């Protein structure tokens, strides 16, 4: 990593950065530790002052505006939160049956030009997208076993809205939108059959093993077929970024990549431990097959296009991803798939 020496004595630049993690969570602890390391790594020239969720900006809308307006210099959100503000952001984190491995997202951002395109889009909003932060997959906990897509028919499932809900509806699911805090009571009362939330570690802490008996995964190696790589990021105020010395800009970019890896690997270790606890509590993992995933993807393709066609920036990002998915190194989408979808 690039560490800067304390050269000429100059006043340190201090950035206030708010995360969407609540204080006391592993996510916030990791974020705080990383922020606190920047002063030393920058030779005292740059200080990141971390804040947990709601500390300065009370909700996501306020957070977005606080960074645009310079009340905060930066934020650490889930990228998907901005789908209503930056339409392209629906393609800046995973979506149903799209690229489903973390390394594929790093490849698209850092090797195939997606980072540059994303920054170009964010600049229109007075923001600078520093880089993606790998996090985890989102998974479904169910009161009933789901051994195939056919088993979804007639189920009432809490899922995020938008593209995810639209694809599940193709398989006869009645989708419900609920805030995280309402999921446990809804499962407990049986008003829903199943619920998506984040990964195993967090879901275990929320008590999901007490109110469900099954965990739905994709084929081996794919924890989730609908939101497998739920990315976070570091986004900063564009003026604050431009005012930073180029060598400090380089440090921040490198440090975001380091932090992405540390955050991801820590969460994965917690997931492995949590799955053992789910098993001990009597939960069973059911897996969809590779054929199920292909069928899910075929249903998703027209929905991808609908979302991409809402906005030219969204389409530019999606076109990059489609080209990558059609490359033989990935092979997720073929010309035949597109023809079948009428594309």
Where on the chain are the PLM-derived regions?
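C-terminal segment of classical bacterial N-terminal signal peptides
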Residues: 2-9
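Short, flexible coil/linker elements and helix-boundary hinge sites characteristic
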Residues: 5, 113, 342-343
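N-terminal secretory/targeting leader peptides
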Residues: 10-104, 120-343
């Amino acid at each position: 990593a690039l560490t800067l020496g304390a050269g000429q004595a100059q006043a340190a630049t201090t950035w206030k950065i708010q995360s969407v993690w609540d204080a006391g969570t592993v996510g916030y602890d990791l974020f705080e530790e990383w922020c606190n390391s920047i002063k030393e790594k920058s030779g005292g020239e740059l200080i990141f002052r971390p804040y947990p969720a709601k500390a300065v900006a009370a909700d996501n809308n306020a957070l977005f505006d606080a960074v645009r307006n310079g009340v905060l210099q930066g934020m650490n959100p889930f990228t998907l939160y901005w789908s209503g503000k930056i339409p392209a952001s629906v393609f800046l984190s995973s979506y149903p049956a799209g690229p489903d491995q973390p390394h594929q997202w790093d490849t698209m951002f850092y090797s195939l030009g997606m980072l540059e395109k994303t920054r170009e889009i964010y600049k229109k909003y007075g923001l600078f997208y520093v880089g993606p932060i790998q996090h985890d997959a989102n998974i479904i906990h169910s009161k009933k076993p789901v051994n195939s897509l056919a088993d979804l028919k007639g189920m009432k499932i809490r899922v995020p809205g938008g593209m995810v809900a639209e694809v599940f509806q193709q398989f006869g699911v009645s989708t419900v939108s609920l805030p995280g805090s309402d999921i446990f009571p809804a499962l407990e009362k049986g008003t829903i059959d199943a619920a998506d939330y984040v990964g195993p570690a967090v879901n275990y802490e929320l008590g999901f093993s007490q109110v469900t008996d099954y965990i739905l995964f994709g084929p081996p190696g794919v924890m989730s077929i609908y939101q497998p790589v739920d990315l976070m990021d570091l986004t900063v105020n564009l003026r604050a970024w431009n005012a930073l010395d180029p060598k400090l800009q380089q440090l921040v970019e490198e440090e975001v990549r380091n932090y992405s890896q540390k955050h991801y690997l820590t969460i994965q270790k917690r997931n492995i431990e949590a799955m053992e606890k789910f098993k001990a509590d009597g939960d069973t993992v059911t897996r969809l097959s590779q054929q199920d995933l292909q069928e899910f993807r075929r249903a998703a393709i027209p929905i991808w296009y609908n979302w991409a066609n809402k906005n030219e920036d969204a389409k530019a990002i999606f076109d990059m991803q489609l080209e990558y998915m059609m490359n033989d190194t990935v092979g997720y989408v073929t010309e035949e798939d597109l023809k079948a979808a009428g594309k």
